[in-house]
């Protein structure tokens, strides 16, 4: 099964594609960040996220997608921007007929590190450790969070399948 994880953001949207087999192994196929820095109009940023994700989706036979849920923080403007980026990401995935699953950042962190309050550095460390990614391979926080979302979905899917047997 091939899963794309998405960490939405208006300036930086992270993505990571993992492959999971029945033998319980998971490997990272690719990851990256869609940057909209230098684009001033919000509508153009959203379009770039949408088109860029479509491009990534066309490279792989994605079975399912996992995306981080939006949380509302104390800054309404940044929360709205995050919602827009998430919508652009969701529409890209849904337009390809791919089922999308949503997880809160707390649920993803708990699944990956054991603590829903884990700092980004701990999430990144556990993502690298789980997938055997060497320290000299550069993966920024946005990609790491997206890969964590994909891993969270893999682990949750396995637990559901195990419970059904």
Swiss-Prot record:
Keywords: Cytoplasm, DNA damage, DNA recombination, DNA repair, DNA-binding, Endonuclease, Hydrolase, Magnesium, Metal-binding, Nuclease
Compartment(s) where it occurs, according to its Swiss-Prot or TrEMBL record: Cytoplasm
Catalytic activity: Endonucleolytic cleavage at a junction such as a reciprocal single-stranded crossover between two homologous DNA duplexes (Holliday junction)
GO MF entries: crossover junction DNA endonuclease activity; DNA binding; magnesium ion binding
Note on how the cofactor is bound: Binds 2 Mg(2+) ion per subunit.
Residues given in the record as Mg(2+) 2 binding sites: 68
Protein task: The RuvA-RuvB-RuvC complex processes Holliday junction (HJ) DNA during genetic recombination and DNA repair. Endonuclease that resolves HJ intermediates. Cleaves cruciform DNA by making single-stranded nicks across the HJ at symmetrical positions within the homologous arms, yielding a 5'-phosphate and a 3'-hydroxyl group; requires a central core of homology in the junction. The consensus cleavage sequence is 5'-(A/T)TT(C/G)-3'. Cleavage occurs on the 3'-side of the TT dinucleotide at the point of strand exchange.
Protein's name according to its UniProt entry: Crossover junction endodeoxyribonuclease RuvC
Source organism of the structure: Anaplasma marginale (strain Florida)
